[in-house]
Amino acid sequence: MAWRGSISKSMKELRILLCQSSPASAPTRTFVEKNYKDLKSLNPKLPILIRECSGVQPQMWARYDMGVERCVNLDGLTEPQILKALENLVKSGATKA
């Protein structure tokens, strides 16, 4: 998982939107609890924003150079699938660099 340390090379910002209580956001909450500290320590200058909003569908947004943004809907994904979605966002940003 060497890609985890290079997130800040391809992304300018990572935003995760989730609901504090909905079952649809449960895997996303678990992902944040298990991975935030590690991701932030590997990418200390990358803004990683966790946005909680009642009733929102879980989503992950990546912002790249020139204001380009990509979104992945996390509804129905498991924690490993969310990690894979993040990896895909990182790799798609690296190909644009």
Curated annotation (Swiss-Prot):
Q: Name one GO cellular component term.
A: mitochondrial inner membrane
How does the protein's chain sit in the membrane according to the entry?
Peripheral membrane protein
**Domain of life (superkingdom):** Eukaryota
Major subcellular location class: mitochondrion
Q: Which InterPro entries match?
A: NADH_Ub_cplx-1_asu_su-2, Ribosomal_mL43/mS25/NADH_DH, Thioredoxin-like_sf
Disulfide bridges in this chain? 19-53
Localization, UniProt: Mitochondrion inner membrane
Q: Which UniProt keywords apply?
A: Disulfide bond, Electron transport, Membrane, Mitochondrion, Mitochondrion inner membrane, Respiratory chain, Transport
Q: Could you tell me what this protein does? A: Accessory subunit of the mitochondrial membrane respiratory chain NADH dehydrogenase (Complex I), that is believed not to be involved in catalysis. Complex I functions in the transfer of electrons from NADH to the respiratory chain. The immediate electron acceptor for the enzyme is believed to be ubiquinone.
What is said about its interaction partners and assembly? Complex I is composed of at least 49 different subunits.
Its family remark reads:
Belongs to the complex I NDUFA2 subunit family.
Which protein are we looking at? Answer: NADH dehydrogenase [ubiquinone] 1 alpha subcomplex subunit 2
